[in-house]
Regions:
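Membrane-proximal basic amphipathic "stem/tether" segments
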Residues: 1-27, 33-35
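A nucleotide-sugar donor-handling region in carbohydrate enzymes
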Residues: 2-13, 133-205, 229-232, 346
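Active-site and donor-binding regions of nucleotide-sugar-utilizing enzymes
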Residues: 30-177
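Conserved catalytic-core segment of nucleotide-activated headgroup transferases in glycan assembly
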Residues: 38-54, 171-243, 324-328, 339-343, ...
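Short acidic-hydrophobic, aromatic-tinged amphipathic segments that line or gate anion-handling sites
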Residues: 73-81, 252-256, 319-330
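Donor nucleotide-activated moiety binding/catalytic core segment of transferases
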Residues: 82-86, 237-279
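Structural alpha-helical scaffold elements that stabilize or flank donor/cofactor-binding regions
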Residues: 85-87, 133, 186, 215, ...
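Catalytic binding pocket for nucleotide-activated donors in carbohydrate/polymer assembly enzymes
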Residues: 134, 162, 276-355
Length: 376
């Protein structure tokens, strides 16, 4: 249950007191989530550090975050309270997957705080994010070689302060790899597809999403549609509209649980354009992706200054198939062909995962060791 406004104000003040008292007596690790979904990427690291006897405080600016009741998480209050808390944090190590620190209302502390950034996507850093999204962090737990190269080049080109670029891995993959090892695929006669559009101008929502659904259902292919959380936030009517139109077809369903991996585990193929979840599926489940070649997902105009390609451009065809928007009608055939070749894709994607991601399946213990080293 979400907190009332009065409870939010009281909780924000109480959190500041608890953080200050904790940091005065101990080397404290603060884990901060803007949204409850952030714990997918930082929660396992916090849990393991705590199991090893380290003092961990979980902070969240989401009043409905279950970590408040389940794991003693502290609510930081509304925008004003959270802003005041972060700018006055006592010396500590602050771990987050929130981008844009220092760009908007949330700033670095005036005190000696070490900021550790954990990636929530495998996408490149220099195009899919806003300008200066990564300027204010001290330590990066990089997911793959491309993150190291991009952040190093950005430091050189833009004259940024020195920061540590660690070869860590991608937390979400640890969980997916473990689940895939235990997963038993159900028997079925036709393929199952997870349709996972990203959000924004490049999304399939803007490029014949319904035609893709129609073509797949017409070929008796099971379709599970899962929107990006930002799409449901800005276009909450989308799901209901499509359920009204296609809900009577037994092969169509809508997945509205953003934290669940059931739709990922159950899919033979994922269809997307620029969504990071497609890469999680490919490397975590070792199954192929169909990318629809919509315009590139760019959130700044300066990415070309690095003179570096983007990881998500380089691997698109290697992870499955690339389909032009004008060829959407061919998607059922492409899906069927990929499913027939699934044993080959398993070995190929495993090799690609080892090339593009640090420490697959071992990110959490590596991250924990790196953080503990920096506490000392």
């Amino acid at each position: 249950m979400a907190l009332s406004r009065r409870e939010q104000r009281r909780s924000g003040a109480s959190t500041f007191t608890k953080v200050r008292e904790a940091c005065a007596h101990d080397c404290v690790l603060l884990f901060f989530a803007e949204d409850r979904a952030d714990w997918i990427h930082i929660g396992p690291i916090a849990n393991r550090l705590e199991e090893l006897g380290n003092h961990v405080l979980r902070l969240t600016s989401d009043p409905a975050d279950t970590v408040i009741g389940d794991q003693g998480g502290l609510f930081t209050g509304g925008i004003v309270a959270t802003t005041r808390l972060l700018v006055s944090l006592p010396p500590c190590i602050f771990v987050t997957t929130m981008t844009d620190l220092g760009t908007y209302h949330l700033k670095r502390s005036i005190n000696d705080v070490k900021y550790v950034y954990v990636f929530h996507s495998l996408l490149s850093t220099h195009r899919a994010y806003r300008d200066h999204a990564f300027d204010s962090y001290d330590i990066f737990l990089c997911s793959g070689p491309h993150h190291v190269a991009e952040l190093k080049k950005a430091r050189e080109v833009f004259g940024l302060n020195s920061r540590e670029l660690l070869e860590t891995g991608y937390c979400r993959l640890d969980y997916l790899i473990k689940q895939e090892e235990q997963f038993v695929q159900s028997d079925r006669t036709s393929p199952s597809v997870l349709l996972a559009p990203t959000w924004g101008p490049s999304s399939l929502i803007e490029y014949d999403l319904e035609l893709i659904v129609q073509e797949l259902l017409g070929a008796s292919i099971e379709v599970v549609l899962r929107f990006h959380p930002m799409s449901t936030r800005h276009q909450p009517e989308l799901g209901a509209q499509l359920m009204t139109k296609y809900g009577s077809d037994p092969n169509f369903s809508l997945d509205q649980s953003f934290s669940s991996i059931d739709s990922l585990m159950g899919a033979d193929v994922i269809i997307s354009e620029w969504s990071g979840v497609a890469h999680e599926f490919a490397y975590g489940c070792l199954r192929p992706v169909v990318f629809v070649d919509t315009p590139k997902k760019a959130h700044n105009d300066t990415y070309s200054q690095l003179s570096l390609g983007c990881y998500e451009d380089d691997v698109r065809e290697s992870l499955g198939a690339l389909v032009a928007p004008r060829d959407i009608g061919s998607i059922p055939e492409v899906v069927t062909a990929l499913v027939k070749e699934s044993p080959d894709w398993k070995s190929k994607l495993s090799e690609l995962r080892g090339r593009h991601v640090f420490n697959p399946g071992r990110m959490v213990p590596v991250a924990v060791e790196q953080i503990i080293d920096r506490m000392n």
